[in-house]
């Protein structure tokens, strides 16, 4: 036991292990999604064409590559999510239920007052934020492991209106946000009847507890 806080030490260890594996599972999901949206360049023939078509239909890009500077239209706003899910699934857009985004994107949405935080009432009857937000009714998961691309500035070259002209462009940071529908990814238990257990060795060092 933690003599300073009265907290069960092994319970703390279990909680830390749970958080660790939750983070690993989240990393795995993001790696899978990154792979899915990279498949437009994979395969051959009809398969490559189908892969590219899927990625194109399910990607809503507001970065406006080639623009001279970053504008408000290149940032998330009140219409971005609705437009993106409509492009992907049309009248089935209501099936989307989870948004995964970078904290910079989430902060921008907060500043625009587009995120609504779930609330609960504590034992004193005071309503408090739960710390989990929704955007247009979709749960928002914030993770700084989301893909981030730093796009370099481009200097103007050539003459405007002539062949080979390249317009100037400011440097900017491009963030990727994923929106998932119900059943997009299934999480299945491995089937272990006892995923972990405690073992105690009373004869060693006055008694040791081991989490196995």
Task: List where the protein language model places each region.
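Sequence/fold signature of self-assembling virion shell proteins
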Residues: 51-83, 104-106, 110-212
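Alpha-helical scaffold segments that mediate packing/assembly in large oligomeric complexes
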Residues: 2-87
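Residues at beta-strand starts and edge strands
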Residues: 11, 15, 94-95, 205-209
């Amino acid at each position: 036991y933690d003599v300073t806080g009265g907290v069960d030490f092994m319970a703390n260890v279990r909680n830390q292990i749970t958080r660790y594996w939750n983070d690993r599972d989240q990393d795995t999901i993001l790696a899978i999604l990154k792979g899915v949206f990279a498949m437009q360049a994979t395969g051959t023939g009809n398969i490559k064409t189908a892969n590219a078509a899927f990625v194109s239909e399910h990607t809503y890009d507001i970065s406006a590559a080639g623009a001279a500077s970053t504008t408000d239209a290149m940032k998330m706003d009140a219409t971005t999510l609705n437009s993106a899910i409509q492009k992907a699934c049309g009248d089935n857009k209501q099936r989307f239920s989870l948004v995964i985004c970078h904290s910079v994107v989430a902060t921008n949405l907060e500043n625009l007052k587009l995120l609504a935080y779930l609330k609960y009432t504590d034992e004193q009857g005071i309503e408090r934020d739960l710390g989990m937000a929704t955007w247009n009714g979709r749960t928002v998961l914030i993770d700084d492991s989301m893909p981030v691309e730093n796009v370099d500035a481009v200097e103007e070259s050539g003459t405007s209106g002539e062949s080979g002209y390249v317009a100037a462009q400011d440097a900017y940071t491009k963030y990727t946000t994923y929106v998932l529908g119900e059943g997009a990814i299934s999480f299945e238990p491995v089937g272990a009847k006892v995923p972990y257990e405690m073992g105690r060795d009373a004869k060693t060092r006055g008694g040791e507890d081991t989490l196995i």
